[in-house]
Amino acid sequence: MNVVEINLYNYGSAGKIMLDIGAHLRAAGHSVLVCYPATGGNLKRKVPDSYRICTRVERNIGMILSKWTGCEDLFFRLPTWRLIRKMEHFGVDAVHIHCLLGWYVNFPMLFRYLRRKGIPVVWTLHDCWPLTGHCTHFDGIGCGKWKSDCRGCPVYRGFPESRVDNAARLLRLKRKYIAGMPALTLVSPSEWLADLAGQSYLKGTDIRVIHNGIDAEVFRPTESDFRSRRGLEGKRILLGVAMAWGRPKGLDVFVRLAGELDDRFAIILVGTSDEVDEGLPERIISIHQTMDRKELAAIYTAADLFVNPTRQENFPTVNIEALACGTPVLTYRTGGSPEVVDPTCGSVVAKDDYDALKAEILRITEERPFSGASCRERALQLTREKMCADYERLLRELVQ
């Protein structure tokens, strides 16, 4: 098969998944073309067999115009035309789309071409943007307008930022160009989002569930001197990990915990920044983004409990990474986050039930009901290898 993979980034969670799938397909004898725009972060990484959909200048100009008009569909025609020509020259058999938002492609033009050619398309729902007229997550604000028309969008100034509320128009365009595509298959990493997709304008589309997976060879129980280096011997370590910290990821919950838990506890947050540090109490140990995954595995291993009080989530790989390192998980019942946890490896409490979360922290760190072995056993059901094999199986099915 000749497979084209398209994503906004070649790094981060979705970018890593895209590259993992690409590497797996190549190892299985398939040809893969990985496509993404020329952003600062993307240009830092050399990716084999890749194609830059647009230049930085094209993206910056289109981004400014899109923000001020709210008409993401009107721009990036030339980059999309070049992408289509590249796919035709490549001899594409199937297209795997990840994140299309982010100012780099003209989605009506792309889907019009894919529909006309009857090319099998797999679209992985890394967030809720494919279902809405604008936002990437509606769970945190309790908005249900995506089920009808997205008129009067309450978050149109949020990512992808716009100065004009054009959400209703963009949702109509998605209905026009995407709904009813016979060769389209949606893949959700969680049962939660698959259910929501079935309630959207995409109901009737073939919807599958393929859980995200992690590298269990990297994320495994890892002995280190982390506790002694940080002066945390004998402490009950609560750990949180996120790409971007804020209220959606429960930063305020950790701040509150720091003010209420006694000195037996230590709180560590990974993935912070100088800006986040300004609002943190001294009790919270802040570790900025680490690119060393083995170092991260050592931090997961050193923790007594991984706490994920997220308010908007799809299927968080951080939960799986913690389990793979033998650390139990405590999470809010948000999105697909609870699907990672079963009774052998952690606990789930109602979303925003702070008192229940705190009570579970005290219980789990005192009773220690979850063994490291049972945590890792659960994580081994959600590996990168299984995820990639499931995607290869699906692509073969659609092409054949």
Q: Which residues are covered by each model-predicted region?
A:
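Conserved donor-binding/catalytic core segment of Leloir-type glycosyltransferases
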Residues: 187, 231-249, 255-258
